């Protein structure tokens, strides 16, 4: 699969529609770049562009937009609520799919060097690309903003990483770097700018200084007034949403606002958000309110409602969640997108993949789906009211496994294909032969790891199936019996696929450990299936 990098350039223009559109065209017309989002703010006088592409393409896209900004933006006239120091204020590169942080650091270095050479402007590196610890954070570099640059550039400690230590009034300076996914998130309040900033100081990690740190790690914050909406905002950057998630920021602002007797009236996501950040927030509110929600779409709706993400403008998940946008922009050629008949014919075709591994994953997903169905058929009606708490615990792991196991249909096929591709590598020289052998061995190990993972996922479901066998709707008895045997058959399939690939692996320790593990997993599946079937046989209608 192609490497995918996200680039999020922030330009200091949020009012002039012609300039905003011209910068967007410069990006979207760059080969290999897909422009996902344009978020312009009049009060901040700033526009955030989000686009994705290969490492090479996103560097070219960012440079194209920078060249256009050089022609259209004059920083000497810029005014806005948001801190800034340049026409292209900041340009981070973010790993999205099949790419490392180190590769994004290279993107930042290449971009910074080329930008400084072409335009003759100072460029600083931050985040994971920083060459100095004092420049890791954006606020540290941007301190004093554009107005402080003339004197700042004269100081030895502020010599740019690229370009001349000279003030360019038209441009200012640019910061580029590599970082994890940053979420720009604002909470709306009916109050003054000063009160919003007071809350921002309470929650941001920096707080009011070293002796008064804030309550939330990896969070930057500032208070401002949004003139076009006539509200104040606590504007935050979540530098690591795994450390401090969306809902934690919202709840902390609400807590502080309540103490000050201030109303919170929803919130706003600027730009795009990872799906995981939304689902983590959903799980928080599901647990907090003891809700029962299975479908991803419904979980997203819950978060939009609880955080008030549609308070200022409609929130369309298909346009705001990066995974949905990336999927929409790519042609999906996976096996699971095929009609059932086409998938069966693909299995029956004259090629090694899809084969037994994909069929085993299909069986596993269908087994989990049948278990999920039986659970749902035993829930939500008055006659099953006494089973409510049991089914709320039993159904979610089956529903989750159903989705995860479907994805493994393609994962198995891809894993085997990587081995087949390695076999085609050139072998004319000793070096080429060595590379080919290493690639083939890695391909075989990957081909083994996928069915092992499948077997583990299946065996995690037996406790749920046992509960269904005890308590589930007896009208669905045969469905649960079929589901149990499908899951058992899937582990048999995983076992056979592992064993046939192990024989060609030269790592004896890996072979022994994997063989023992998959044999144990097969025995566990046999016992789990037998117990479920025995429990069902004892029950009478």
Swiss-Prot record:
Gene3D superfamilies: Formiminotetrahydrofolate cyclodeaminase monomer, up-and-down helical bundle (1.20.120.680), Formiminotransferase, C-terminal subdomain (3.30.70.670), Formiminotransferase, N-terminal subdomain (3.30.990.10)
Pfam families assigned: FTCD, FTCD_C, FTCD_N
Any one GO biological process: L-histidine catabolic process to glutamate and formate
Assembly: Homooctamer, including four polyglutamate binding sites. The subunits are arranged as a tetramer of dimers, and form a planar ring-shaped structure.
Reaction(s) catalysed by this chain's protein: 5-formimidoyltetrahydrofolate + L-glutamate = N-formimidoyl-L-glutamate + (6S)-5,6,7,8-tetrahydrofolate; 5-formimidoyltetrahydrofolate + 2 H(+) = (6R)-5,10-methenyltetrahydrofolate + NH4(+)
EC number: 2.1.2.5, 4.3.1.4
Disulphide bridges: none
Protein name, per record: Formimidoyltransferase-cyclodeaminase
Amino-acid positions noted as binding folate in the UniProt annotation, renumbered to this chain: 163-172
Gene Ontology molecular function terms on file: folic acid binding; formimidoyltetrahydrofolate cyclodeaminase activity; glutamate formimidoyltransferase activity
Region (Formiminotransferase C-subdomain): 182-326
Keywords carried by this UniProt record: Cytoplasm, Cytoskeleton, Folate-binding, Golgi apparatus, Histidine metabolism, Lyase, Multifunctional enzyme, Transferase
Residue ranges of the region described as Linker: 327-334
Chain spans, region Cyclodeaminase/cyclohydrolase: 335-541
Record region (Formiminotransferase N-subdomain): 1-181
Role noted for this protein: Folate-dependent enzyme, that displays both transferase and deaminase activity. Serves to channel one-carbon units from formiminoglutamate to the folate pool.
Subcellular location: Cytoplasm, Cytosol; Golgi apparatus; Cytoplasm, Cytoskeleton, Microtubule organizing center, Centrosome, Centriole
UniProt similarity note: In the C-terminal section; belongs to the cyclodeaminase/cyclohydrolase family.
One Gene Ontology cellular component annotation held by this UniProt entry: centriole
Active site: 82, 412
Lineage per the UniProt record: Eukaryota, Metazoa, Chordata, Craniata, Vertebrata
